[in-house]
């Protein structure tokens, strides 16, 4: 892990825990090695650094290309491992970069919805993340951030001291159909979309509190 990244993560962790009374649940679920995708909901500009500080491994982020137009913002984003991507989903270069990072054993954070939710609720996933999962074959770790839409709503420049929670789900591998390699056209696109929808479903299953231990059934 690069020294600059480690330093920035430390600052964000201090900010997250002191200003937002932040809590992180199930961070130990992240794989210790190998490439994987972190898939999270997106409701605020606070999300990328807050999700990144919760990860024990260095992560790479997909970020909207328009955020890089200012040279200073672009430099900061790139130093924080952000990769510019076009919102319309047609950025072949960014997709190749994602696949290369995953192939090199890196953790890549993606937002399946493609943009911030306007009201804090989960939105429909786009097929792009499904395509990357299919082409890379890596596992996906669903994660969810709670409260950032209230901490930094749309149109606001300064964050409020609202409590935040980041929670990780179980890593999972998508069960591809037996004939996946033969699929083409609309049938292949349907699988990509189904992968994306499954990821969003698992994100939606996460709740902002610790998991309850399973109760052992008593024998009769």
Residue ranges, per PLM feature:
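Short Gly/charged-rich anion-binding patches and loops
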Residues: 10, 25, 71-72, 96-97, ...
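Non-catalytic C-terminal accessory region of glycerolipid acyltransferases
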Residues: 3-4, 93-220
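Catalytic core of membrane glycerolipid acyltransferases/transacylases, capturing the structured
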Residues: 17, 27, 31-89, 97
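Short, basic, glycine/proline-bearing loop/turn elements
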Residues: 11-13, 79-85, 112-116
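Short gly/ser/thr-rich secondary-structure transition/capping motifs
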Residues: 17-25, 148-150
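N-terminal membrane-anchoring alpha-helices
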Residues: 1-21
């Amino acid at each position: 892990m690069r020294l600059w990244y480690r330093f920035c993560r430390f600052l964000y962790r201090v900010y997250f825990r002191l200003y937002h009374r932040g809590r992180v649940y199930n961070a130990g679920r992240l794989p210790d090695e190998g490439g994987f995708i972190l898939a999270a909901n997106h409701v605020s500009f606070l999300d990328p650094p807050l999700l990144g500080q919760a990860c024990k491994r260095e992560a790479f982020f997909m970020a909207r290309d328009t955020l890089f137009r200012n040279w200073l913002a672009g430099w900061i984003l790139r130093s924080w491992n952000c990769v510019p991507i076009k919102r319309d989903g047609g950025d072949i270069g960014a997709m190749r970069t994602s696949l290369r990072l995953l192939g090199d054993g890196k953790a890549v954070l993606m937002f399946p919805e493609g943009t911030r939710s306007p009201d804090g609720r989960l939105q429909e996933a786009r097929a792009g993340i499904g395509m990357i999962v299919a082409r890379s074959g890596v596992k996906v770790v669903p994660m969810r951030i709670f409260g950032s839409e209230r901490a930094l709503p749309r149109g606001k420049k300064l964050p409020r001291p609202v409590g935040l929670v980041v929670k990780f789900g179980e890593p999972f591998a998508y069960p591809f159909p037996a004939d996946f390699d033969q699929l083409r056209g609309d049938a292949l696109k349907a699988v990509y979309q189904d992968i994306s929808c499954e990821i969003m479903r698992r994100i939606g299953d996460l709740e902002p509190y610790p998991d309850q231990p399973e109760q052992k059934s008593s024998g009769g």
